[in-house]
Amino acid sequence: MIKKNYEELVSFFADDEFILEMIADAMKSFPEYVNRVYSMETQMAIISVRYDGEERANRIASLDQKRRDAHEVAIGSCKMLNRLAEEAGVEKFCPETDDRYVVGDFCALITSEFFASGKNYNSLDELITNMKESVKGGINA
């Protein structure tokens, strides 16, 4: 559903290179936020065993700031894409909120939906179940 609405938005602005560039940049912000969360979570475990005291705190604070910055960009991207969708008369596909948790969940959802493009799943749950089974088979092989 998100992808369909996104494609309608892009089609509406097909002749406006500047707007298309803005849309492309906004869409990049969602997987970038997901990547920042992933990076922070994986690096924190390493930082926790390698550093103590102030050095540990500084490194974790730096990771958290990068994640927060990416989150703010994603929130701004949602607002901009919703304004463009309204202008185009197409259904908005971003949440209309400043709630950090909602926008964070949206970033994961939209990234998953585009990742699953071309695969025939009826739901995100089905996609995740299938992905877990696929990875499990590869790990135990």
Annotate each predicted stretch with a short phrase.
Residues 9-32:
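Short, charge/polar-rich alpha-helical segments
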Residues 14, 86, 114, 129-132:
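Intrinsic disorder/low-complexity segments in short proteins, especially the signal peptide
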